[in-house]
Amino acid sequence: ACGSCRKKCKGPGKCINGRCKCY
């Protein structure tokens, strides 16, 4: 469960294998 990656990254992000990857 990533939750909201956009909020965690404070920008664009993607959920991969249950983790947020930020761009």
UniProtKB/Swiss-Prot annotation:
Compartments in which it is found:
Secreted
The feature of type site (Basic residue of the functional dyad) is located at K14
Keywords assigned by UniProt? Amidation, Disulfide bond, Ion channel impairing toxin, Neurotoxin, Potassium channel impairing toxin, Secreted, Toxin
Q: List the residue(s) that the UniProt entry marks as the site Aromatic residue of the functional dyad.
A: Y23
Supply the SUPFAM superfamilies for this chain.
Answer: Scorpion toxin-like (SSF57095)
Q: Which cysteines are joined by disulfide bonds?
A: C2-C15, C5-C20, C9-C22
Name the Gene Ontology molecular function terms of this record: potassium channel regulator activity; toxin activity
Q: Where is this region: Interaction with Ca(2+)-activated K(+) channels?
A: 13-20
Keyword Secreted assigned:
yes
Q: What is its main location?
A: secreted
Leader sequence residues: none
In the record, Tyrosine amide modifications are located at Y23
Q: List, alphabetically, the GO terms of the cellular component aspect.
A: extracellular region
Question: In which tissues is this gene expressed?
Answer: Expressed by the venom gland.
Similarity comment: Belongs to the short scorpion toxin superfamily. Potassium channel inhibitor family. Alpha-KTx 13 subfamily.
Supply the domain comment.
Has the structural arrangement of an alpha-helix connected to antiparallel beta-sheets by disulfide bonds (CS-alpha/beta).
Biological role: Reversibly blocks Shaker B potassium channels, with a dissociation constant of 200 nM.
UniProt protein name: Potassium channel toxin alpha-KTx 13.3
Species, as recorded: Tityus pachyurus
